[in-house]
Amino acid sequence: MKVLGLIVEYNPFHNGHLYHLEESKKISGADFVVCVMSGNFIQRGEPAIVNKWARTKMALSAGADLVIELPLSCAMASAEYFASGAVRILNDIGIVDYICFGSEHGDVKTLDYIAQILVEEPESYKSFLKEELDNGLSYPAARESALKKYTAHSINIPQIISSSNNILGIEYLKALRRIKSSIIPLTIKRINNDYNTENITGSISSASSIRKYISTSNSTSFDDVLAMTMPKTSVDILFEEFSAGRGPVFKEDFYPVVTSLIRKMTPEQIRNFAYVSEGLENRIKSAADTAGTYEELVESICTRRYTKTRVQRILMGILMGVTSKDLDMLSRFDSPQYARILGFNSKGKQLLSQIKKKSSIPLVLKLSDFIKSCDPVLKRKLELEILATDLYVMCYKNPAFRKAGQEFTQNIIIM
Amino acid sequence: MKVLGLIVEYNPFHNGHLYHLEESKKISGADFVVCVMSGNFIQRGEPAIVNKWARTKMALSAGADLVIELPLSCAMASAEYFASGAVRILNDIGIVDYICFGSEHGDVKTLDYIAQILVEEPESYKSFLKEELDNGLSYPAARESALKKYTAHSINIPQIISSSNNILGIEYLKALRRIKSSIIPLTIKRINNDYNTENITGSISSASSIRKYISTSNSTSFDDVLAMTMPKTSVDILFEEFSAGRGPVFKEDFYPVVTSLIRKMTPEQIRNFAYVSEGLENRIKSAADTAGTYEELVESICTRRYTKTRVQRILMGILMGVTSKDLDMLSRFDSPQYARILGFNSKGKQLLSQIKKKSSIPLVLKLSDFIKSCDPVLKRKLELEILATDLYVMCYKNPAFRKAGQEFTQNIIIM
């Protein structure tokens, strides 16, 4: 029994994801697949286009056996926290043999070598780094330069660390090294066209191009373009959600809620929220005063230092009321602390009984039971998860599905 | 020079308003008309269908000469506060000779007699009242019974005080008496069909039937039904707003903002807001958790004691962050303290120069100047006005008009 772990968002599940899933099984020789998936809000600081239960169905119908939720506090965080949270879950459940991630580079040894340097920080690397920092370079620039020097230019560092999936991959590898995990990392070279993620370009298109297509098309039933770039089961699940009036959910739907919150606050109040560092509160305030759309709001806060995804995560933090204090409290944990099951198939059921034996963290099958018994900090974390969903569902087109408390009422997906 | 004062909402201005305006001029013999009008939020605790500047245009084009804003803290308040705020402004500007209001009863003497009893509280009335309260009657029921006894059944008290415009009229009369105003009150019997305010019934229809019609029809240009029940100038202004994408604004537009705010709060936090008395916080909380629409939210909070309009005002208070503390502070004033000009015509300009000489309260022509010079409590009141508009404009369909600060940038309407 070989178990493969995948770290995913599936927003929504498309042919590229299917390719990755099938190739990963092939190269690992694994016969079971566990996915750790972000929930109703994703790493970019946006709501997912359809909820996590629908995306769980997509994953299971495409070959995943078990889907575990990456808690919001890890899912909607920087690449480093996202990666370490997901890796910790896959490690802590005690049954995963391989992790396979997509990367632009495609060679796990090189990426892992970089991860090793960054985790172990050998003396000469550290002195290169210090030198560059003393020269006035920013931390990322100093790190890049130190890596180049340390590897004696044997690796094309700038090219590798300029690609988002390589960066994320290195973070997975760092996380595995830090916890001395026995999980074997693998990577698959990404085959999608990264030069054009804006538009659907063929059978393999980016998730963002698909979301963009959905936001501009008004398809509510069968759609040629989506059928070309997503597995049929995914398209069916997507339209099942749309026709029920549960989505598509877009960040734009949060314009009134987020902007009105900020318009009501003073810059000093904005300052209290997570990741709002000095000066940014004024940018956020004046952006909310002038912005007519969510996109405008984000764009007018962004700077070179504050990237779009970082700004989006900050705004979602404001939406959910996550203060710097909360963040301090939540980050006292170095791991997600629990594995919440979103769905499984019959093979996943076998995995669950293995996990029950081997996991070092509790398995959460029923949130209402778990929340009663857990400690206060974990409780705050779960309350955040519950609130996030209570706010997410308000964006549904169909009022009948906007009820709060769906984290308690929604059943685990069993396929 | 005779000046007539009208207290209005014009949401939107229709034939019934025109009839009232013209009849009032006729019976008073006045040659000038000053309107005190609620702003972007109205007495029922709802946003106005189009903004106050558009409604000012409607008023001026229908025969009003000067429009003064009733500040939010009075406009979105109980009949008593609404009436006393509006009457105080008309009194304090020092030039108004008559106030003429619509009433179901139509006889100002009878209404004023009731007002006199309620203001002066003669001994025998007071003892009737005490008796009924001691018998366990609610205050409104005890008052009704005491009035019946005091007037020795010479007036049909129950019939009079069961009609909303009589009630409001009595409040105007009470306010005039309390401040010993020299303004002469007049009333006109309302001619609209009160038995059916749900649907447009003819050339005189209620404002709520017109709003309902607009919410269900999708007219964005000329419309037969509206043309039948509103003056042409009003219809034109309405469609000018709609086609620019500034409205129609409905309370339903506030569903995500208000509901998400409440979903984030504990009942204890809800308790801090204005007019939320013991126990209501739990109703509000659970209503927000289950409601899929604003209408549902309101309906599930209402009780016999908490009427729909009261609940709506409470929800708007939560939206704007008005706490009980704020309310205590704001109600330290017994009058609006200033007269903010929304618009005028050439005759209104003449009035303004008279007001400048005779008014006991400052005339606000430029908010940015006034807010700098006023005292802290008044400043809080104005900030509330500014915030209300900053939140109101976010509901516009056209993102270009959603900017904050329109209280500062919008010019006075001069026609």
Swiss-Prot record, chains A, B:
Domain of life, per lineage: Bacteria
Binding-site residues, ATP: 7-20, 102, 165, 190-191
E.C. no: 6.3.4.-
InterPro entries per the UniProt record, alphabetical: Rossmann-like_a/b/a_fold (IPR014729), tRNA(Met)_cyd_acetate_ligase (IPR008513)
Record Pfam families: HIGH_NTase1
Keyword Nucleotide-binding: yes
Gene name tied to this protein: tmcAL
Biological role: Catalyzes the formation of N(4)-acetylcytidine (ac(4)C) at the wobble position of elongator tRNA(Met), using acetate and ATP as substrates. First activates an acetate ion to form acetyladenylate (Ac-AMP) and then transfers the acetyl group to tRNA to form ac(4)C34.
Recorded family membership: Belongs to the TmcAL family.
GO cellular component: cytoplasm
Enzyme class: ligase
Compartments where located: Cytoplasm
One of the record's GO molecular function terms: tRNA binding
Catalysed reaction equations from the record: cytidine(34) in elongator tRNA(Met) + acetate + ATP = N(4)-acetylcytidine(34) in elongator tRNA(Met) + AMP + diphosphate
Name under which the protein is recorded: tRNA(Met) cytidine acetate ligase
Sorted UniProt keywords: ATP-binding, Cytoplasm, Ligase, Nucleotide-binding, RNA-binding, tRNA processing, tRNA-binding
Main subcellular location of this protein, as a coarse class: cytoplasm
